[in-house]
C-alpha cells in the first residue's frame, strides 16, 4: 500500500528547509542599505543560499537517525553491540533476601523459595516449594541446583545453611457441578482447574521482557533485581496453604459455563478411600507445617470422567439440564498441558541491530548548482575574466563545503564517541603496563609490542576532502592543490598517544562512565606517573618509538593507563555494578573472585591474576569473608566475626609501598564495603604474605572439595552437621578455617603450619591411596643459599626477587 506524507507534519527546525529559507531571506532583506535589500527571487545569491541550506538540512536529517543506526558498525554482518542492553545494564545479582529467593526459585519445578535465618551467624536456611509432586530424585536435583545457585549468586557475608524441600499436602476436591447448556464441558472444566490451582497453589507467572515493556512497564521495573532464566516474575499473592470452600465456590460460579455448585467435599485421600458425605460441614482445609498444598487435578479429571467414585456415592458429579454428563479425560488433559506450555517466557529482549547509514558520505553541492553558474567547467570560449569569476565563486563556496564535509565526517565519529572501547590494543597495553606496575624488566619484544599497540590506537576522522572539487586546478596552485588534497585525505589529525588524543579519549570515557553514575580516581591519586617514569628512557630508546619528548612520556603513560582503567571499567560495567555485593563462588573454583574484589581492583587499577603475589612485586589483593570461616568443631563463627570482611594486601611494591596510596586504598575499601559488614585491612610483608597465600590456597581447596566434583550426594545441612571424621572433608575445612581465622584475628601474623594434615583422602575407598584435589601449593619463600644445588632438599633452590622500584613522582 502506498504511503503518503501527512500534510500537517511538523518538522523539527533543523529539518524544515522552508522555514530556514524564510528566516535566512528575512534576515538578509532586513539589512538596510546592504546587498539584497531589493530582493529579487531570481537573484543568484538566493540559489546559493538554498543550496547551502540543503546541506545543513541533510546534516540535521542524519542526526535524527535512530541511536541504533548511529552506532551501527560498517560491516553488515558484525554481531557487536555498542552499549550494554537493558538486561545487562539494569539487572543485578541478588542483594536483598527477596532477590535471593527469586533466584533460588528460578527452576521449572519450583513455585517459590523462602529464606529463614539459621541458628549459626551468617547462614541462611532455604525452604523450596515445588509446583508439583516431586520424587526423591527430583527433590535431590532441586536441592543441588539451589545449593549451587546460592554459591554462584551468594551475597557477601552469607552462606547456605540447610536447604530443604517442602513435602506435599495433597488436597482432593469432589465438586458436584451443573454446567450451562451451551458451555463446552472440557474447556470449562480446564479453566476451572486452572482457577482453583491459581487460588490454592499460587504458581508463579513469568512473562517475557518484551511483553512487560509492551504492557507499559518501565525498563527499571522489568529488570529490577536478578535476571531470571524463566523470564520476568510477576508480583502476585503467595500461597497461604489454606483452602476455603466459599472461595472455591465463588470462583466456580464466576466462571462462564458453570451454572450451579451443588456440593463441594474436601479430602486428604483419593476417591476410593473417601466416604461420600455431602453434609459433613467441612468448609476449610489447611496444609500441615513445612508442607505445601497440592491440588490433585488428575483425581478431579477421573472424578468428572467417571473413572473414580467415592465410597457410597449416590449422585452424579457433573450434569447439564438435569442429565448426567461425562467428559473426555484425554481432551481435558491435553487442554491443561497446552496451557502449561503456553506459560513459557523468554528472559530478555533480543539484541537490536541498527542499520549502517554511511554518515560520512557528503557530496559537494557545487556541481549540483544550475548550469548557468558554470561551476561544472567554463565554456571553451570563456574569457579570462569569466574564468576568474568562476574561480572566485568556487573559492567562496569551498570553506562552506569543507565545513559541511567535515561535519559529515564527524557524524561518523558518533559511534566512536558513544560506543564502548574495543580492540586488541586494550589487552596488549594493559598487560605491558601491569608488568611496569610490578617493577618487572621489559624485554625488547615487550617494548616493540608496546609501540605497535600504541601506533594502532583508534583514530578519529575530524575532516575529509571535498569531492568532487570543480575547478580545483584553476583555483589552487599546483603545490597548494597537492597539499590540500594530502591534508584533506588524512583519516586522523592526531598523532597516536598525543596529548590531544589522550585528553579527548579521557573526556569521552569519563562522560560515558558518568552516564552510569560512576567515576574513578584521577591519575595523580593513583600515582601512575611515579611508576612509569622508570621506563620512559628504555621505551624511547627503541627504534619503533613514536616521536614523544622524554619529559612528556611518563605523563602520557599515566594518562594512557587511566584510559585503560576507564575502558576496562566500562567493558565490565554490567558485572562490576550488578555483582558489587556478591561473594566469590568458592564451591566452583580455586580462583573465583567476589564482585567486590573485581570492583575495587578496577577502581584502583590493580590487576587481578591467579599466580601468588608473594613471589614477586605484583599488585593484587585478597578478600576473606568471616562467614566462611567455621570453627574446628564445626560451629559457626561468632556474629561479630561472621560480619567481617578481611582485605589482605601486600605492604610493599611501587605503589603499595607508598603511604598516600595505601590511604587511598583504605578509603576506597570503606566506600565500597556494604554497611552491614565490617572491613578489616591487613597489610603484609613478603614473608607474611607468602604464609598467608599458602594457607589461603589450602582453605580454598577445602571449600572446593566440599562443593566441587567430590560434593556429597546431599549438599546443605549434611555438610555442616554430620560427624566430622579425622579424614572427612568437613574436618579438613574446619581445621583449615580455624587456622586462617586465628591468623587474621592476630593482626595478620601468619604462624607456621603443616599442610600435610589437610591433604585430600577422598579417593581412599576407591583406589586405596591419598591424593590432592589437583591444586599446587604456593612455593615457600626461604633465605637464598649461594652454594645450594637444585634438588638438594636441605638447600632448596630459590629464585631471588628484586626489590620493587620506588615511586618516582
Report residues per predicted region.
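Hydrophobic/aromatic interaction determinants used to assemble and anchor large protein complexes
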Residues: 1, 703-707, 739, 760-763, ...
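Extended, charge-rich low-complexity interaction segments
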Residues: 705-753
